[in-house]
Structure formats: C-alpha cells, structure tokens
A protein has these predicted regions:
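Divalent metal-cofactor coordination and adjacent catalytic microenvironments
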Residues: 1-148
Length: 148
C-alpha cells in the first residue's frame, strides 16, 4: 500500500528511506508501525557518518512515526544540505501475512473477490477509481491514515 495508497501504510515489513535537509527536533517518517531505524548523515566535511542506535528513539503520535534524539542527547552537527540526513527504517505490521490484522486481511480478500466477480465491469471502466463496498470500508477504516 505505501504512503500514497488507500491505507497510507506498509502491511508487511518493508525497508524505506526518508531523506532530510539536516537534523531538526524530530525527524517525521511518512509511515506508521516503524520497528527499526538507522540514521546516517554527512558531516561538515561531507563525510558519511552513522548515528549510534542508542542516541535516538523511535516514537509515534496521531500523525505518524518519528525519530527523536534520546533524552540528554543532542543530534550531531550535519551539513545543511538536501538529503544530508538519511533515515532508513522498517515499517509494517510484521514479516508474515499473519501479522497483518485479521479485519484488514478480510477486507482485502473481500475487495479482491468482488473485483474478480465483477471483472468485466471493472475492465470496461478502464483505469479509473473503483469504489469499495461498505463492508470493505468498515473493515479497513481503523487502519486508514488520513493526511492533509
């Protein structure tokens, strides 16, 4: 699904990378359910450095996951340049399909079954948007991320 999908999240664990133009108080990630992260940055001389994993925390709020410096820790000095700080992270419910919540799996199966049963109608529409049933919407609604 990814950040631009219907749900706005990764279902099965996937590795993503988000680039930043330097360190700031928090480094907001585009996906929720982040389980691991690594941070690299370019120092003032342009040399790539790695932030010690004990120097930051992975947190989340109502918007998404984010990375913040650990308590009593200050971010290192990074070159203020496009993409000078890089966060590589794992997002998703887990490694296995069974890790995806049951109601979400059920909604996906219902949607795929409905599309298969009505494939002639779907193919006539072309590549336009396909409406989901009320049942599918109800099953996936708790996992849908609304963004502005």
């Amino acid at each position: 699904d990814g950040y631009s999908g219907v749900l706005g999240r990764a279902l099965i664990n996937q590795e993503w990378r988000q680039d930043f133009d330097g360190f700031c108080r928090i480094l907001r990630l585009p996906l929720p359910n982040v389980s691991a992260a690594a941070i690299t940055y370019d120092d003032a001389d342009g040399v790539e450095q790695t932030v010690d994993s004990g120097s930051f925390r992975i947190l989340s709020d109502h918007m998404s996951a984010y990375v913040a410096a650990s308590l009593d820790t200050v971010w290192p000095s990074a070159r203020m340049d496009a993409g000078s700080v890089r966060v590589t992270f794992t997002a998703g419910f887990g490694d296995e399909p069974a890790d995806v919540p049951a109601s979400l799996r059920s909604g996906i199966l219902l949607m795929v079954g409905d599309l298969y049963e009505n494939r002639a109608t779907v193919s006539e529409r072309g590549s336009g948007r396909i409406d989901m049933s009320t049942t599918v919407n109800a099953l996936i609604a708790p996992y849908r991320r609304m963004t502005v």
